[in-house]
Amino acid sequence: MAKINTQHSYPGMHGLSVRTTDEDIERIENGFIRTHSLCEDTSSELQRVISMEGRHLSGSQTSPFTGRGAMARLSRFVVSLRSWATRHLHHEDQRPDSFLERIRGPELVEVSSRQSNIRSFLGIREQPGGVNGPWPLARFNVNFSNNTNEDKKEEKKEVKEEKKEEKKEEKKEEKKDDKKDDKKDDKKDDKKKEEQKKEVFVIDPSSNMYYNWLTIIAAPVFYNWCMLICRACFDELQIDHIKLWLFLDYCSDIIYVFDMFVRFRTGFLEQGLLVKDEKKLRDHYTQTVQFKLDVLSLLPTDLAYLKLGLNYPELRFNRLLRIARLFEFFDRTETRTNYPNMFRIGNLVLYILIIIHWNACIYFAISKVIGFGTDSWVYPNVSIPEYGRLSRKYIYSLYWSTLTLTTIGETPPPVKDEEYLFVVIDFLVGVLIFATIVGNVGSMISNMNASRAEFQAKVDSIKQYMHFRKVTKDLEARVIKWFDYLWTNKKTVDEKEVLKNLPDKLKAEIAINVHLDTLKKVRIFQDCEAGLLIELVLKLKPTVFSPGDYICKKGDIGREMYIIKEGKLAVVADDGITQFVVLSDGSYFGEISILNIKGSKSGNRRTANIRSIGYSDLFCLSKDDLMEALTEYPEAKKALEEKGRQILMKDNLIDEEAAKAGADPKDLEEKIDRLETALDTLQTRFARLLAEYSSSQQKVKQRLARVETRVKKYGSGSLSVGEPEPEKPEEQKKD
């Protein structure tokens, strides 16, 4: 430990003498000594400062705290004591938070003892990254303005360096964040890729592709249902064409296998969307009964051929379990065909033939088991050449099956018990199945003739009416011809009746598909809004005119406009014979008269006679329907009126003075009518309110009367709020 010898002669001529070695000073400054006590730290610190001052004043007899620079030395001594006092304070490690660093500014960094002492004395905060070099004591005199300027410059440099470092750190953090974002994006992309991988190829059950596959799979199913029973019962058929049957059998098996893959990829709707997840598709199919039947239909029962031989096609009867595919094909075809009634009849006939075919094969098999020709019921003896042929065997069995199931004609009676049992079952099956089939056929035929019967009923009622009213023969003939034209050209369909079960959206789409192109041909509707055109399309009504019919006559009030769909119309003179112009498909007329354009010289009246040359199909749009549609489109109404006004001005058919004069008297009349209707509604509402008011007044009067009676009986005290009514005497209660 350093020893301190001081002479207490301050402020005398003798200075403080310190005896210590250089090694001790280095150990004290660098901290490579044992743990000191508080007194030892104080002594070593004082010795270090005083020795440094003693070196500068060596050879001088004056006191270190007197003379030139005394104040600076004294201040350094005081600062060294303060720095020593704060040396052992515990400094917390700061959080590596860039946000907090930006908020609270640059940090304070520990520097060498001399620099910290001097700067604390001057009140200067040093930023981190400062220069930790030695501070010459000679610079510190009374006038230390130069030192402060240099400190400020150094501080500015340090601040700049810190800002650069902060920017570098921020860039590094941004790079890290970008890398994290890139990793997140990569993860999202990987998830999307995984989802895309999950979405496998799916067949929409309502698509043409699925229907085409049903057509393919229906062929082997129908083959198995027709040929397996026939080959099992007629041995000659199986033996003579064994190679053909093997080829067809295994081709059908291959199609069966592919059909299972198709079922695994057949989508289904979940919440209105087609499911494309492989696992869901697989679970949806495997949980159905049809999956079990499909698996059973593919069991390799053909392996028994290796032991029993190839003459046992009944081993393949499990292939018949795919019958659901055949029914599904028939259902899809029925919804797609344009002739559903004809298809239903053909489908029922096919079912009848299959039932008769199976019954015939079973009859021949029973005859073979009992013995050919053993009695009159079984098939005759095959040893007879006439009955030994394969074609005769099948046709005879088919004939017997048809007679038995339809109960038409007589068949040989059964002899043995098993024969009786088989005939009884045949009769029951025939009665049940054929009663159902014949009933369905009858209803289908009646449905096919329903439209004709309904139309004929209308014609008959018109004939009876004309006969009752004694209509002329010429007019009656024209009416009958008009009905014949409607029937032959299939124009008897009431579109509203047919489309009434469809939603409004589909009705609009059908109407747009049928009538929109025709409506766009009209000049005033060419630039209209799409919504208005759709409204008008739904209001178009088809009409048919006979030869010689007048569509409109000159001077008639125009309440409709017409668009020619098919046929020819002629603009004729007053005599009805002279033709001025012939109008054909796509032409239109009467569009100006339904707009009520102010100043029109013709008003709303027709300006020409138009007559049908032959049968003509026209679309009619009434004025009321147009105005009803235009109520929701006021701007479109103004545009239509402006277009109509321009057309009239081109043809010099508008009176500009009348248009500028004001409203048309007819328009005023219409407004007056509307005001009258509004006034009527207001009067009814006022009468209702008046009745309610009078009833409420009566109730108030009744309540006031009751209050007055109570006041008279019990006095004013009974009217106090919250006070109960006085009890009535017992005599009054009895009364």
Curated annotation (Swiss-Prot):
SMART domains: cNMP. Residues 1-214, 268-292, 336-342, 450-735 are cytoplasmic. Residues 142-191, 715-735 are annotated as: Disordered. It is found in: Membrane. 3',5'-cyclic GMP binds at residues 532-654. InterPro entries: CLZ_dom, CNG_cation_channel, cNMP-bd_CS, cNMP-bd_dom, cNMP-bd_dom_sf, Ion_trans_dom, RmlC-like_jellyroll. Residues 149-191, 725-735 have a biased composition (Basic and acidic residues). The chain crosses the membrane at residues 215-236, 247-267, 293-311, 317-335, 343-366, 390-424, 425-449. It comes from the Eukaryota. Its main location: membrane. It is a multi-pass membrane protein. Pfam families: CLZ, cNMP_binding, Ion_trans. This is Cyclic nucleotide-gated channel cone photoreceptor subunit alpha. It comes from Gallus gallus (Chicken).
